[in-house]
């Protein structure tokens, strides 16, 4: 019965070319642009925060805004290398262990946010220690602007018709070109809204109204917690990766497994930030 009802209530997939433009053999994709926009926005926004002295403890930013100019390359390497290695290890290890030459082929798709955040975290730690910057404040500076990039990349996932959701009869379900004959949740857009719009707005309020940058580690903790919760919610609507399927009980996915520790780590980071600030008061 549901199969006969689904076609009448679903939306056609918008025919948007994943390639924005080509210059000879070079093709610029929406997905790649999403990463560039995300990194550049976090760079610009981080510098804006560092110039606003009143936001920081003792009105003293942890670094000069110009320090982020040097960090951009570190961030790009952390995102790309971490994202790719994370995808290989978490989502398709058996394939890549048999086809190691395919590991560097990021242009064929396959990036993990959880791997990307681990790679970026390592880059931030190494950069901060090499420049004498407090690591927790480095985390905060970058985390505050990351949701914008997440939102843009998720929209690019939608344009690419990838990472779509489970079969659904909701009025806004979409027929994806490679998603089979039945309409599905546009779960990429759910993620763009929760991980991008909502999470950025929450962090914006914590930074500019709550003045939480005065508590090193709080904003980073809020970001990690917010992302983890958002991802867990969306995983109930998102189709699990074909090569993994459900890990348990027809509902548990790899995305959930990787996100639960993020929530716990984020809550701990916020608790630690509050506790440390209270001791220093």
Curated annotation (Swiss-Prot):
As recorded in Swiss-Prot or TrEMBL, the protein's gene is named lgt
- For this chain, the annotated S-S bridges are none
**Classification via Pfam families:** LGT
Annotated membrane topology: Multi-pass membrane protein
Annotated EC: 2.5.1.145
Q: Where in or outside the cell is it found?
A: Cell inner membrane
List the pathway annotation.
Protein modification; lipoprotein biosynthesis (diacylglyceryl transfer)
Task: Give the signal peptide range.
Answer: none
* Membrane recorded as keyword: yes
Q: Which domain of life is it from?
A: Bacteria
Ligand binding (a 1,2-diacyl-sn-glycero-3-phospho-(1'-sn-glycerol)): 154
GO terms of molecular function:
phosphatidylglycerol-prolipoprotein diacylglyceryl transferase activity
An annotated GO cellular component of this protein is:
plasma membrane
What is the protein name stated in its UniProt record? Phosphatidylglycerol--prolipoprotein diacylglyceryl transferase
Query: Where do the coiled-coil regions begin and end?
Result: none
């Amino acid at each position: 019965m549901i199969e006969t009802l689904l076609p009448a209530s679903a939306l056609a997939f918008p025919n948007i070319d994943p390639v924005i433009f080509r210059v000879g053999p070079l093709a610029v994709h929406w997905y790649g642009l999403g990463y560039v926009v995300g990194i550049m926005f976090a760079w610009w926004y981080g510098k804006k925060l560092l110039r606003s002295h009143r936001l920081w403890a003792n009105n003293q930013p942890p670094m000069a805004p110009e320090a982020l100019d040097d960090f951009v390359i570190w961030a790009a390497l952390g995102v790309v290398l971490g994202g790719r290695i994370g995808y290989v290890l978490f989502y398709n290890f058996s394939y890549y262990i048999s086809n190691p030459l395919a590991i560097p082929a990021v242009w064929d798709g396959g990036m993990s946010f959880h791997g990307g955040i681990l790679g970026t975290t390592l880059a931030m730690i190494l950069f901060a220690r090499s420049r004498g910057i407090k690591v927790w404040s480095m985390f905060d500076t970058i985390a505050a602007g990351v949701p914008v990039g997440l939102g843009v990349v998720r929209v690019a996932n939608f344009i690419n018709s990838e990472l779509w959701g489970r079969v659904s009869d909701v009025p806004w379900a979409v027929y994806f070109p490679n998603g089979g004959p039945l309409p599905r949740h546009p779960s990429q857009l759910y993620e763009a809204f929760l991980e991008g719009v909502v999470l950025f707005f929450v962090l914006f309020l914590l930074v500019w109204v709550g003045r939480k940058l005065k508590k090193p580690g709080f904003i980073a903790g809020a970001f990690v917690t917010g992302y983890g919760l958002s991802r867990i919610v969306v995983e109930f609507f998102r189709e699990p990766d074909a090569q993994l399927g459900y890990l348990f009980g027809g509902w548990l996915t790899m995305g959930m497994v990787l996100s639960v520790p993020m929530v716990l780590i984020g809550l701990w980071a916020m608790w630690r930030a509050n506790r440390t600030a209270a001791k220093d008061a």
